[in-house]
Every structure is written in C-alpha cells, then in structure tokens.
Amino acid sequence: MRKRKLSDRVRCSARLKNRSCSGAHSSSDHEADTYGPKKKAVSSKNTDKKSPKKLENDEKGLMESDEQEFINKTDNTASNESNAGNVNTCPSASPFSDLNEVSRNGLTDDSEDGVGFSHKTSSEPSKVREVYLNGSPFVDEDSNQPMPLGLFFENADLMQDLPPAVPCCASMSRREFRNLHFRAKEEEEDDDDDYADGLVNEGNI
C-alpha cells in the first residue's frame, strides 16, 4: 500500500512538473507570438531612425574629404606656380643686372638707327601704363602742360632729347630784322593807298 501511495505521489508530482513546463512553454510561445512583431517593429524603427543619421554622417564625411582634397590641390597648384615664378624670375635677373652694370659704367646700348638709349627708357613706358590709363594728353588732371610724345605714344625713340632746331635766319641781326619789318609796313601802306586811289578813280568814271 505504501509503495502504491509513493508511486502515485511520484506520478502526480511528475504530472505537475510536466504541466508546469508545458504551461511555461505555452506562455513563452504566447509572448513570442504577441511581442515578436512589436519588437521587430521597434527594431525596424530604430534602424530607420539611425539610417538618416548615418547617411548624414557619411555625407558630411564625404564633403569634408572632398574639401580637403580640393584644398590640397589648390595648395599644390599655388606652390607649383610660385616655384615656376621663381624659376622664371631667376634667369631674367641676369640681363637686368648686366644693364645696371652698363648704366653704372656710363655706357648705353646703340640701336639700329644709331640712337643710343639706356634701359631706363624701357622701364618708363611700363610706369606710364600704370599711371596714365585715362589716355588724356596732359601730364596731370590739374595741369595745363602737355604730356611728352614719348609718354603719350609709349615710344622710347620719341622720349629722346633731340637737339634744338636751328633757326634758318640765325645770322640776321636785329637791325636788319627791323629794317625788313619797316619795309614791309611801308609796302603794305603803299598797297592800301594804291587800292584806295583805284576805287576813287572807278567812282569818278
């Protein structure tokens, strides 16, 4: 009898355990069925919220990288241009230095026409281009003095100091000039008198 009771108790306890396990499984399955889609929806919302942020961050990173590349390229081009400018200015310094030496020694270059001029005349037109851009024939706006032809036309040959023109009657004295002047006046008066006499004679006729 005792053995049967013990066996019945064991069976009952086993049944209760099985029922509790089955209830737990069923409850877990029910929770999975009910909360599963909600969790999936929440996770999908989180991914949707995170995706634009990630896209914005990626776009910002791309923009920054593009800006850095552009800045690097501009810096490289500027450095290359400066290097090229230095290379171009170095060989051109030698002729100017030679011209400076020549001007110090008091020598000038002779052109094909035989007119000598120094290197300063070549630099003056460049200054004129900077100063006289309005094309006015006067030196300054407030002055009445005309501009030299060399500055106006930017020609080095016209800027040369030409010798003064020799007058053709340089040997004539003042007395001779006065005599000629008085003679011319007398001739004009005689012509006027003759013309008046002619008019009077015509009126009488």
Swiss-Prot record:
The lineage of its organism: Eukaryota, Metazoa, Chordata, Craniata, Vertebrata. Residues 46-63 have a biased composition (Basic and acidic residues). Belongs to the UPF0688 family. It is found in: Nucleus. Residues 1-128, 184-205 are annotated as: Disordered. Transmembrane segments: none annotated. This is UPF0688 protein C1orf174 homolog. Keywords: Nucleus.
